Amino acid sequence: MTTAVQSFLGNNYKTYIVLFLCALIIGIKLGTLVPLLSLILESRGYSNTEIGLNVVAQPLAVILFVRVTPIIIHKIGLAKSIIIAQIFTIILYFTFPIFDTLTSWFIIRFIIGFAGALAWNAFDTWMLSMADDTNRGKIVTIYNTVFVIGFALGPMVLYMTGIEGWLPFVVISALSFAAIIPLVTMEIDDPKLPDKKTLPVLATIIAAPTIFGAAILCGLDDVMFVSFFPIFMIKNQFAQEIALQYVTITLVGGVICQPIIGVMLDKFNKRTLMNSAVIITFICPIIFSFYLDNFYVMAVSCF
């Protein structure tokens, strides 16, 4: 078994397994946190605009600190960056029930966004620094798939914990703690990073505007969907539990389609596939909204 895994992932297979496990746990945590906060704010009577502005706090921090996180990672190393970021988020998750105003939540989510960007950049850098041309594609595919699986499980965790009281925040904090246990207890190599000058952000955007734009839109679509879809369902007289189940159906569709899309990318024009995906993403929510009384159409549209 070990030989087969090593043959598939390469000599750094132990490190990859640890990072995949951490990505799974963090995916579960984020898949729980994002809809949790939106549902709590909606239950308190905040408008969609106020909820949306609150949601934006985390990605806003990622954008503003895009040049800062690589400096920190080079200073203290990859493993320490992930551990410190997760410890910060553990503390911050417990502040949500204490400071429950909209402004305080914006500040908390902004700081969590910075910590999340630090951890995620460290994960990506670690993963790609070990990969080479022989295994980079499969490593990135597994990494993304594992994270999406975790993200898909998040709404189910929320289904079990509910949105009331401290319990959901305790569970999310426990998941953050679980993510750092393998990094602390297992002997894995923290690779030495080369001293390379990073490209200016503007130059990167100019070099690949389509990819950059697609990444921004996909990230925005994912966050807004998980944040607002449960609210939309509840306002259309669906139970909270049912709303979360439809979110999971959508995310499971993303997991199942990952390898299919990977095969299609090798056989068809990439830009055509991307444009097709955009059209499907645009049409399916419209179809969904017209068939709220038909489970099969709703499920297929979400998937």
Outline where the language-model segments fall:
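Helix-loop boundary and gating motifs at the non-cytosolic
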Residues: 10-59, 210-211, 219-233, 243
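Helix-breaking motifs and short loop linkers at transmembrane-helix boundaries and internal kinks
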Residues: 77, 98-103, 269, 291-293
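Structural signature of the two symmetry-related core transmembrane helices
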Residues: 80-94, 272-287
